[in-house]
Curated annotation (Swiss-Prot):
GO MF, any single term: protein-transporting ATPase activity
Subunit structure: Forms a complex with SecF. Part of the essential Sec protein translocation apparatus which comprises SecA, SecYEG and auxiliary proteins SecDF. Other proteins may also be involved.
Role description: Part of the Sec protein translocase complex. Interacts with the SecYEG preprotein conducting channel. SecDF uses the proton motive force (PMF) to complete protein translocation after the ATP-dependent function of SecA. Probably participates in protein translocation into and across both the cytoplasmic and thylakoid membranes in cyanobacterial cells.
GO biological processes: intracellular protein transmembrane transport; protein targeting; protein transport by the Sec complex
Record keywords: Cell inner membrane, Cell membrane, Membrane, Protein transport, Translocation, Transmembrane, Transmembrane helix, Transport
Keyword Mitochondrion: no
NCBIfam families cross-referenced by the UniProt entry: 2A0604s01, secD
Transmembrane segments: 7-27, 305-327, 334-356, 357-377, 402-422, 429-449
Cell compartments where the protein resides: Cell inner membrane
Name listed for the protein in its UniProt record: Protein translocase subunit SecD
Membrane topology reported for the UniProt record: Multi-pass membrane protein
Amino acid sequence: MLKQQRFLLALIALLVVGALIVVTPFGKQYGLGKINLGLDLRGGSQLTLQVNPTEEVKDITPNVMEAVQTVVANRLNPEGVSEIVVQTVGSQQILVQLPGVSDPKDAEQLLSQVAQLDFRRPNNAILAQVNVRSSELQRLLQKLPEAEKAGDAAALAKLQGEVQQKQKQLTELQDQFFVKTDLTGEDLNDAGYAISQSQPNKWDVTLRFDVDGGKKFAALTKSLAGTGQPLGIFLDGKSISQATVSDRFKANGITGGAAIITGNFELEDAKLLANQLKGGSLPVPVKVEEIRTVGATLGQDSIRQSVYAGIGGLILVLIFMGVWYRLPGLIADVALCVYGLLTFACYVLFGVTLTLPGIAGFILSIGMAVDANILIFERTREELRSGKTLYRSIESGFYRAFTSILDSNVTTLIACGVLYWLGSGLVRGFAVTLGIGVAVSMFTAITCSRTLMFTAISLPNLRKIELFDSKRAVS
């Protein structure tokens, strides 16, 4: 038991030190140390998007708007923790709110493309014509130096005209060189970016297909393996990569459901393309109609007063716990401070953006953390008054309260999961902050409070029943 307490104390100390590093300015050198505030707390940018019909999608129906809204949200907020608000306005417009973003160029660029990815194979009928036109063009190009030396202006002009004509014909044929296959961006599960293994200081875009997409990719690469014909990867109809497939894949093609786009990308371009593909392709193009800078809903004075009120309320809770529950209350105060530190560290690590609903979720989780400690201490008092020893009372108090705490927190986490799954924007933010707070409160109430309590009673000066219950005399 003593070894276990020492281990848990060391773990708690390690977590506290790690959390301090994360939430303090020291963490800024690692890209941490800062909690993002939402649009209602610090302002930001607001984009109005116009959804435009196409020849394929002539009517912008509610289903189309819902699909566009989902893709926009997935592109701008792939992890689902930044409180970006994406909502429809009218029949053909979408409003996007970006908290804390004063220059939304990245967001505008992220939404500028439909991002329809497709894989294409060479058209064998066109391939023969391309080879013929390429040979003819090469022969004409070889004649140019001789014509220039001859000094016959008319003959040179005629030859240059023929070269331009052949180049035009070749370009037209090359536009038809690739034909679409059934492998598209719809078959992707995920997309990312990684440092290129073949080109220094360049980046590749990594793709992972779903089960059907993996099978299609294997079949496509098998048919091209060893032929010398390129596999074309196109984005919105433009070629972004062409690669040949080695003959060692003749038997089964490239299996495993993964692919790499080696397009000589810079980091920002690779990240942009990966986020576009991860978010999915837009069913119709969108155009940024308006960009506005939005001020915070609450002024600085209101925010400052709210912070003071929150700190004052927390101090009153800490004082009440210490006065009413004596030593266990003081231990609970320490556990609550650890809880707050760990929770804020989680918010920083997960990139959570705090808004007013998010703060409400955090405050609610504090209440649940206090409630868990109260359950434990009341159970402990009951055991003490029944005549049990101090150690047995504490052990039994934690054991009897555990089921109630677990049931309460699990049901809350289920509710948070439902809100996160079905909600969006501010509702998701409330669910995330509450869910993280509840999960951390379970750890601090059961592990932190328990470890500190047993550590306290291991000290002779603190092993006194009157420090736990004033109504029971010292035995």
